[in-house]
């Protein structure tokens, strides 16, 4: 089994067939809708909120609303769908969440996307929730996770998941790998590669993305969609407190299983950090799209499919050549 991560890989260019990178198409059909880029912000409180969710939907970007304000979910679905936009929510696996799904069915509220959002998604509770959703609201596109093995992907797909999230603890504010000894931190890209061999349905690569080039690498190794937290945090439009440290502006960014999110010091597998203010989120999205268009042009194609077949080399932890600050 080849083990590697994002910084160990360089993709090998093919002959370019476009005059300009602007000819390259970055769109992706994911579930019932088509999106501008194969990227989704992490469903975390310091990355996504209702205002941003609406802007993303209006502008043909995928989003997943977090699940940490449970009472707000039904009004959110109604507001989005009454505005002619798609609703994409998250659920957990506690008993109340099973009741919540039944309530949606009773009220004939059918979110276009439901993400079952659990740190260790290869579990009976997630399998039961997938089946529960598919029984009561079969028209919702169900994303389940997170997993780190082909067995996990297969079991969730067999239960009825329409897409699976791959990644156990590789994120910047996730400390699962340190607290538990388990996870895909340090080999997330290889885990994605292995999982893709078993997958029959789309995969979302979740965690460990540090550069825009990592998006192209994720697609090469089997992802249809790439979930990103830290690169989307700390923008003007981002949720989270802005603080000034040594004359510079920062925003807080914390993990979904951190004490800052939970409000208590119990079962903590996330940490909090301050990320330097990055300016406009719209500028970052535009730059991501342009960089991905460049990636496609280097792959010798005109759309995302061309990235899936490029050759690569493994250059252990050396692609930055010491260029890190």
Swiss-Prot record:
| Keyword NADP in annotation | yes
Alphabetized, the UniProt keywords read: NADP, Oxidoreductase
Q: Where is the active site?
A: 174
Q: Which reaction does it catalyse?
A: IMP + NH4(+) + NADP(+) = GMP + NADPH + 2 H(+)
Enzyme Commission number(s) of this protein? 1.7.1.7
Task: Look up the coiled coil feature and give its residue ranges.
Answer: none
GO cellular component terms given for this protein: cytosol; GMP reductase complex
Q: Which GO molecular function annotations are given, in alphabetical order?
A: GMP reductase activity
Checking PROSITE patterns in the record gives: IMP_DH_GMP_RED
Instruction: Specify which residues bind NADP(+) according to the UniProt entry for this protein.
Output: 203-226
Tell me which Gene Ontology terms the entry assigns under biological process: purine nucleotide metabolic process
CDD domains named in the record: IMPDH
| Family matches, as Gene3D superfamilies | Aldolase class I
NAD in keyword set: no
Provide the function of this protein.
Answer: Catalyzes the irreversible NADPH-dependent deamination of GMP to IMP. It functions in the conversion of nucleobase, nucleoside and nucleotide derivatives of G to A nucleotides, and in maintaining the intracellular balance of A and G nucleotides.
Q: Which family does it belong to?
A: Belongs to the IMPDH/GMPR family. GuaC type 2 subfamily.
**What is the protein name for this chain?**
GMP reductase
**Organism the protein comes from:** Staphylococcus aureus (strain bovine RF122 / ET3-1)
Q: Which gene encodes it?
A: guaC
